[in-house]
Each structure stands twice: as structure tokens, then as C-alpha cells.
Swiss-Prot record:
Classification via InterPro entries: GreA/GreB_C_sf (IPR036953), TF_GreA/GreB_CS (IPR018151), Tscrpt_elong_fac_GreA (IPR006359), Tscrpt_elong_fac_GreA/B (IPR028624), Tscrpt_elong_fac_GreA/B_C (IPR001437), Tscrpt_elong_fac_GreA/B_fam (IPR023459), Tscrpt_elong_fac_GreA/B_N (IPR022691), Tscrpt_elong_fac_GreA/B_N_sf (IPR036805)
Domain of life of the native organism: Bacteria
NCBIfam families: greA (TIGR01462), PRK00226.1-2 (NF001261), PRK00226.1-4 (NF001263), PRK00226.1-5 (NF001264)
Gene Ontology MF terms in the entry: bacterial-type RNA polymerase holo enzyme binding; DNA binding; RNA polymerase binding
GO CC annotations, alphabetized: cytoplasm; cytosol
Family according to the record: Belongs to the GreA/GreB family.
Biological source species: Escherichia coli (strain K12)
Keyword list, A-Z: DNA-binding, Transcription, Transcription regulation
Free-text function comment from the UniProt entry: Necessary for efficient RNA polymerase transcription elongation past template-encoded arresting sites. The arresting sites in DNA have the property of trapping a certain fraction of elongating RNA polymerases that pass through, resulting in locked ternary complexes. Cleavage of the nascent transcript by cleavage factors such as GreA or GreB allows the resumption of elongation from the new 3'terminus. GreA releases sequences of 2 to 3 nucleotides.
The protein's name: Transcription elongation factor GreA
SUPFAM superfamilies: FKBP-like, GreA transcript cleavage protein, N-terminal domain
An annotated GO BP: DNA-templated transcription elongation
Length: 158
């Protein structure tokens, strides 16, 4: 497997979720399975089957997170010298030259992306267009809604 780029915050969130799943959720599910077994016949026991299904989802998520963390290339952008260039983990303020709107994005890994919080995946069209650009650069980015022209206003390594 290839390295998965991830910010320090993203890796911390995954570790927290993994800890929660292992220390809280897994024991809850095991207890639910044990309780459902006490009700007798497992073939027609809906509680048992539901708990087993939850166990499958939980164990699958644990394996998924462990795989991502073992292949993660954690990048702490705050430790890098800010040369004004857009890189993975950077917070970028751009001016949409078509709508004259200023927008701020943080370029993060796929698992961390949340457009509502302005966290965009490094593999998104906007991030791919901005990577490598510097302050005052103008770039035309092909988005699902058509071509959009942006000017890079500010690049921060927060």
C-alpha cells in the first residue's frame, strides 16, 4: 500500500476514534451479544443478529483505521518553513474572480475532508489546482460546475 497523506489533526482524530471503538464500543457490543444469547434460540433472535452486525461494522472500522494509521504519512505543516507556496496541510485564502468572493480552504487528506468546514481533499479539483501556487498567482480550476478562476490571496501553515 502507498503512503496516505494525513495532517497531524487528522491522525489524532483517527487515534481517538480507534481508542473509542476499542475501549467503549467493542465492550458494549460484546455485552449486547452476551445478553441476546441469554434469550435462547439464536436463529430467530433479532437482538443477537443486530448485535453481531454491529460487531462486524465495528471490527471492520477498527481494521480500516489501523490500516490507515499504519500507512499514514503524517505531515505537520506547522513545522515547515512558510515559503508562501500552497502545499498539503496549508490553509489557503483565495478570491473567486468570477463571483468576487473570498474563500478559505485547508488542504487535508481524503478522510479528513469536510467541505462544510472548508477542509478539502488533496485529491479534489480545487486542491490539485492550488498545490504549488504562491500568493498573488491566478489559477483556472476545472470544477464539476465549470471552470473557475481564483487568485491566491494568502497561504498559511497553521
Amino acid at each position: 500500500m502507498q503512503a496516505i497523506p494525513m495532517t497531524l489533526r487528522g491522525a489524532e482524530k483517527l487515534r481517538e476514534e480507534l481508542d473509542f471503538l476499542k475501549s467503549v464500543r467493542r465492550p458494549e457490543i460484546i455485552a449486547a451479544i452476551a445478553e441476546a444469547r441469554e434469550h435462547g434460540d439464536l436463529k430467530e433472535n433479532a437482538e443477537y443478529h443486530a448485535a453481531r452486525e454491529q460487531q462486524g461494522f465495528c471490527e471492520g472500522r477498527i481494521k480500516d483505521i489501523e490500516a490507515k494509521l499504519s500507512n499514514a504519512q503524517v505531515i505537520d505543516v506547522t513545522k515547515m518553513p512558510n515559503n508562501g507556496r500552497v502545499i498539503f496541510g496549508a490553509t489557503v485564502t483565495v478570491l473567486n474572480l468570477d463571483s468576487d468572493e473570498e474563500q478559505t480552504y485547508r488542504i487535508v487528506g481524503d478522510d479528513e475532508a469536510d467541505f462544510k468546514q472548508n477542509l478539502i481533499s488533496v485529491n479534489s479539483p480545487i486542491a490539485r489546482g492550488l498545490i504549488g501556487k504562491e500568493e498573488d498567482d491566478v489559477v483556472v480550476i476545472k470544477t464539476p460546475g465549470g471552470e473557475v478562476e481564483f487568485e491566491v490571496i494568502k497561504v498559511e501553515y497553521l
